[in-house]
Amino acid sequence: MSSQIKLTKNSYRAEKQKLNLLGMYLPTLKLKKALLQAEVQSAMRSAAESMAANEQARDRMHAFAELFSIPLYTDAVEQCFSIDIFEKDVENIAGVEVPLLKRVVLTSLEYSLLDTPIWIDSLIASAKEYVLSKIYAENAQERLRLLEEELRRVSIRVNLFEKKLIPTTSQTIKKIAIFLSDRSITDVGQMKMAKKKIQQHKE
């Protein structure tokens, strides 16, 4: 429940100051919202491209699906490369810290050419492509998620300012102003009446 409005000059000044602050802060919020909307659109495109690349890599790897069901070949792929370098950082976009994937390096390990079929290179290359594309796709999705989350938060604040805080404060100022004006008129009337009575007593 909201507190009762104090119909005083101090309250009037406080509400006017509050309205000024809201009016000053709203453009900043709206600018941030616009920036976030642009960044979200960009992140959506990047995420879509990364997901498409990952799906294509997965489809190419599915060509070897039967081979992945054979433990000998599955073990060969698992033992033939590893994630050697994984560099991540944090990037600030419109005030939001999002993960930045700087570099991922998959290192190929030595394996016996005599003990593996000639197509094992294609199988390993397909698996490496899939792993890399999945890492980048997951990073792109996380960036998008964080930006969308902040956009929702800022949008809620903009709506709160525009639909509730500013109109409510303006209405409060108007109500106090009307009350103070009416009271001033009443006070003037009472003063005139008092002066008139004093004058009558003198006569």
Curated annotation (Swiss-Prot):
Task: Specify whether Transport is a keyword of the entry.
Answer: yes
List GO molecular-function terms, semicolon-separated: ATP binding; proton-transporting ATP synthase activity, rotational mechanism; proton-transporting ATPase activity, rotational mechanism
Would you kindly state one Gene Ontology biological process term found in this protein's UniProt entry?
Answer: proton motive force-driven plasma membrane ATP synthesis
Q: Which UniProt keywords apply?
A: ATP synthesis, Hydrogen ion transport, Ion transport, Transport
**Would the keyword Transport be found if you checked this record's keyword annotation?**
yes
Q: Which Gene3D superfamilies match?
A: 1.10.287.3240
Family matches, as InterPro entries: V_ATPase_D (IPR002699)
The entry assigns this protein to a family as follows: Belongs to the V-ATPase D subunit family.
Q: What does this protein do?
A: Produces ATP from ADP in the presence of a proton gradient across the membrane.
The family database entries (PANTHER family) matched by this protein are listed as:
V-TYPE ATP SYNTHASE SUBUNIT D
Q: What is this protein called?
A: V-type ATP synthase subunit D
Q: Which organism is it from?
A: Chlamydia muridarum (strain MoPn / Nigg)
Gene name linked to the record = atpD
